[in-house]
Amino acid sequence: MSLLNVDKNEVEDTLYELLVGQSDVEKTIVKDVVENVDLIPSNVNLSGAEIELVGIDNKEYILKEITDKIKNNYDYIIIDCPPSLNMLTINALTAATSVLVPIQCEYYALEGLSQLIHTIDLVKDRLNNDLEIEGVVFTMYDARTNLSLQVVENVKENLQQNIYKTIIPRNVRLAEAPSYGQPITLYDPRSTGAEAYRLLAEEVINREVE
């Protein structure tokens, strides 16, 4: 949320309240945090939702029920998942129609990717038949290091899924943007990071219309 200049400590209703049934989705949405972008905020309380959901029937579908109420109001609903494969991530995968998988160009990237793809396959088989892997995007890429080059090569050799041509580089301006409460396309629209994300957005949209 820091990317969108929303103070997570000041919002009254968040995704946590939605998941545990203490708020309404329309009340929780923060309108136009950036032009044409709405947000359902979250904060540290979200980590407690996992415990709150224990014992609830069909708890895997709670987020889907929420997004189904608003999906006709938007061109895209983007669910930003935690890196851990917990019940919140399962909820996101059950609610989604497709998954964009970011891979940091680091040593354990391939191992983590294999586990995620296995989880996605299980969710598709048991909870959400419509779920597809939209594509894989490399992030934190540094062309000066052999490690980045090796990760990209290994993933391409071992992965049958679509891989986006656009690669997100390691970029100082990208790292700075959250502290200024802005997405990179506003903070420094001419930076290599901003240009990479624009190209990725175009690639995602173009795949949708093909």
Describe every region a protein language model picked out.
Residues 1-210:
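P-loop NTP-binding core
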